[in-house]
Amino acid sequence: MKKQLVLGVLFVFPLLVYLFFASGKNNFAKLPTLTPNIQSLPINKDFSNRSVTLKDHISILGYWGGDLSDKKAEALNLNEKIFKRFNGFDDFQFVFFVNEENEEEVQALKNALQTGTGTDLSNWYFLPSSPKQIQSHFQSLKTPYQLNQQYSTPYVFIVDKNLNLRGRNDDEDMEEAKLLWEKQIEKLRQSIGS
């Protein structure tokens, strides 16, 4: 009798655990569309000459422009918080607009990610872009944010398979976070200037 009970528990319990986790919510589907039909990519090849498109992909879109000096920490954070979690999906990708003159800096950043954390960069795309292309595409998102003088922003954006910008539009902490970020930047500028 004990053997049958133990065997029953060993078979039924994993099945119940699987059913519990399989019924989990897909939070991405609940994100509202903030901007429908954003502009498609003005460039269809990355620095490594690989084809890239937003259509039919779930994309994390970043605008790093000519400001790559301090992006290693952001890249590592994005890798840990987002990429490692969703890397198994074939249609998931990171796409970054980068100044077309920054190929060496992009390669150094990629090397740091690969050697430091062993990141698989097959779904990371760095697009060589002109400032005009970066600005034009960023404006198609219609967000309240601005690019800095280097055509860069610390924010990343979620774009769905149909080129819709997704995200939260009721974030109570957004203004507070923006003010805090601006204060941090101002402190950094003051420390560099003095």
Question: What is each of the regions a protein language model found here?
Answer:
Residues 138-146, 161-164:
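Short, surface-exposed amphipathic charged segments that create phosphate/polyanion-binding patches used
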Residues 73-127, 131-137:
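Structural microenvironment flanking redox-active thiols in thiol-disulfide oxidoreductases
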Residues 1-46:
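N-terminal targeting signals for export/organelle localization
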Residues 34-48, 73-76, 104-108:
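Periplasmic c-type cytochrome electron-transfer domains
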Residues 122-124, 142-157:
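Structural micro-motif
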Residues 150-194:
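Thiol-/selenol-based redox modules, centered on thioredoxin-like
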Residues 55, 89-92, 151-154:
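Extracytoplasmic
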Residues 50-79, 94-95:
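Short active-site neighborhood of thiol/selenol oxidoreductases, capturing the structured segment around
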